[in-house]
Amino acid sequence: MNRFFKPLALAAAAVAMLAGASAAMAAGTPSGTSISNTATVNFAVGGVTQTPVVATSPGFLVDTKVSMTVVPAGGAGSVVNVISGAVKQVIPYEVTNTGNLVNDFLLATANLASGTTFGSPTSYTDNFEASSCGVFVDSNGNNSYDAADTAVYIDELAPDASRRVFVACDIPASRVNADFSAVNLTATAASGGAANSQGAALAATTGAKALNTVAVVLADVAGSDDLANDGKVSARSGFLVQTAALTVTKAVGAYCDPVTPNINPKLVPGAYARYTITLANSATASTSATLRAVADTPV
């Protein structure tokens, strides 16, 4: 009886050992890396060590994980203060490649619908559209928008690397204090591998995994204006008009006249009239104003 149970027990032990073998993990491993694995069973029979039994599994290639983050440089929920009539006002963003392959990233910005609310801890409601908006990539790494920043897509962004991106818009001159324009930035993953050449947007590989090919897996999270696993991530921000709220009043009164120069002067022919111009910036205004000139024009 025992002679039949011993091989069975040995086989069961071997199965248990194989079942407990750890799986090869590919988290953080570069796309296209070849992974192989060998199982070795060391055993003895009757106290005598036997030749190890070795099994080699088929190798496989690590797939491409596509993911990224897009965050306003001022933090989630942040907005940028602007003044009415200003041009090339900038919202800086940070785009990070959280995937496992060098990628290009296509960039786009959009004005959000009127009535859109955004902001934290203070929430603002969109009531106008910024104009002439464009997206530009920081060219020299100084995190400031310069005339040399003309690239409109991110070229060859390595895994775990980040790049500063600017959404630049003009603010209409008619806007008043506390007006708000909500915008977003969307980054779409594209194929890399060719410097200074814009790649095509990546699409997920369909069907079962083939061990000897590299599949594309869209692993991005849902952004503010897109879905999860769609190869893109978006994030919102906006322009908040912060300007002076000036009022001007003009009063007139008799200063002196040739009949009664110093006693209750009247505005008779030959009299002098005094105009008083008063300027005020509202106590609730968001910023101060610099007085350049006051024109007093007779009509």
Task: Annotate each PLM feature.
Residues 1-11:
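Bacterial N-terminal signal peptides that target proteins for export
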Residues 2-4, 22-299:
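Exported/extracytosolic protein signature
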Residues 11-19:
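Bacterial N-terminal signal peptides
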